């Protein structure tokens, strides 16, 4: 009998990677503008459920999450709080990680965009794209939504407001670097048409094709000079890298990508990602900007981007200004972590928004867990005692 010893790939951080089929799943990294509510927390719970299921099927799962920590909004929030941006994001990132741990999520990597290795690679990626001719210097003049960290033309606004969040936008005029989006548009359209599973659900794919790709892409502003809290452009340090170029690259920097060609074995095994699980409000960044950046870097695209719906309060999307926010730790204190996980996974369809409230949680948990499951367990125990 010949016994073969299985070899392992040792990934970044010393994590052994087995010969089992890999499954790389990510959430969007949470923006560190404040404490996440249950609507934000839903995504990490869903990703965790998928990761656990894939592990049970025999996959070697790598599950990455983390925090997005740069941008104008962060700089303004820190100024309001009277502390430095780094102190502000340290506090918020710690709180986000605490809640992810409270929800018993089994992530393998928690990346921060202020991590030294991430910042180093973002600088190298920007320079690589510039040297390739995909990034050029110009002047930006248009509208900017600070909460979304997004640029818009006048024609893209809805009633003069941000088409994504509905908030007011501000005029912006500054020197900036731009990425040649149109250079890769036809290639991306072809990829979407030949890979129907790439953008899911189908409604999200249709939205991206009809509203953005088919009408034609404009070049994207990928640097800012009107604020300082960001990763500086190495060869032009008065510019900081646009927050979405910074944030999106976490999916490759977190597993060992190196723009100079010295990527880790872990990266070579894990990439492309099997699933990017994100909210429907950021689908454009992940299915247009991100794949085009990857094409420019000569990297394969993720296998699937799934834009999940929102978890709403009874009167609409959760908002601190509306006073309708529910926090995960408050719900866990009252119901327990497993009950909260059960509710958000049960109540969220994949096509439409779900609704959460204290009343709905009590009703669902009493109906399903206390009554149905409780009755089943009681009958099973009674029969076991009686007949065995």
Regions found by a protein language model. Name each.
Residues 2-7, 12, 16:
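Polybasic, lysine-rich low-complexity intrinsically disordered segments
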Residues 18-65, 117-121, 171-386:
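Structured secondary-structure scaffolds
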Residues 59-60, 83, 105, 134:
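Short glycine/serine/threonine/alanine-rich loop segments
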Residues 67-73:
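Short, charge-patterned binding micro-sites
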Residues 77-90:
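A charged helix-plus-loop insertion that forms the helical arch/lid used to bind
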Residues 88-144:
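A broadly conserved sequence feature marking short terminus-proximal activation segments
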Residues 132-185:
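Cys/His-rich short segments
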């Amino acid at each position: 009998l010949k016994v073969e010893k299985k070899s392992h790939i040792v990934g970044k951080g010393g994590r052994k990677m087995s010969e089992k089929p890999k499954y790389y799943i990510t959430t969007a990294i949470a923006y560190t503008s404040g404490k996440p509510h249950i609507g934000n927390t839903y995504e990490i719970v869903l990703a965790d459920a998928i990761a656990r299921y894939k592990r049970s099927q025999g996959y070697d799962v790598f599950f990455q999450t983390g925090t997005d920590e740069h941008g104008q909004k962060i700089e303004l929030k820190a100024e309001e709080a009277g502390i430095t941006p780094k102190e502000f994001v340290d506090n918020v990132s710690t709180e986000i990680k605490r809640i992810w741990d409270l929800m018993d999520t089994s992530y393998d990597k928690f990346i921060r965009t202020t991590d030294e290795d991430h910042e180093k690679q973002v600088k190298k990626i920007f320079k690589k794209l510039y040297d390739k001719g995909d990034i050029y210097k110009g002047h930006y003049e248009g509208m900017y939504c600070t909460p979304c960290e997004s640029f818009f033309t006048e024609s893209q606004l809805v009633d003069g407001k941000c088409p994504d969040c509905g908030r007011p936008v501000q005029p912006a005029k500054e020197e900036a670097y731009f990425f040649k989006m149109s250079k890769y548009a036809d290639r991306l359209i072809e990829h979407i048409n030949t890979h129907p599973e790439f953008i899911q659900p189908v409604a999200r794919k249709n939205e991206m094709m009809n509203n953005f790709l088919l009408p034609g892409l404009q070049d994207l502003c990928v640097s800012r000079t009107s604020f300082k809290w960001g990763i500086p452009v190495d060869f032009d340090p008065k510019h900081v890298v646009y927050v979405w170029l910074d944030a999106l690259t976490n999916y490759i920097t977190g597993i060992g990508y190196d723009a100079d060609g010295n990527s880790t074995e872990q990266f070579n095994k894990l990439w492309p990602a099997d699933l990017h699980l994100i909210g429907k409000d950021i689908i454009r960044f992940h299915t247009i900007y991100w794949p085009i950046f990857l094409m420019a870097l000569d990297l394969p695209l993720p296998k699937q981007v799934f834009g999940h719906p929102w978890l709403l309060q009874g009167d609409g999307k959760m908002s601190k200004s509306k006073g309708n926010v529910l926090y995960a730790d408050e719900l866990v204190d009252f119901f327990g972590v497993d009950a909260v996980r059960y509710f958000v996974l049960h109540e969220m369809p994949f096509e439409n928004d779900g609704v959460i409230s204290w009343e709905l949680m009590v009703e669902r948990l009493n109906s399903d867990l206390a009554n149905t499951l409780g009755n089943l367990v009681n009958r099973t125990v009674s029969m076991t005692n009686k007949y065995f």
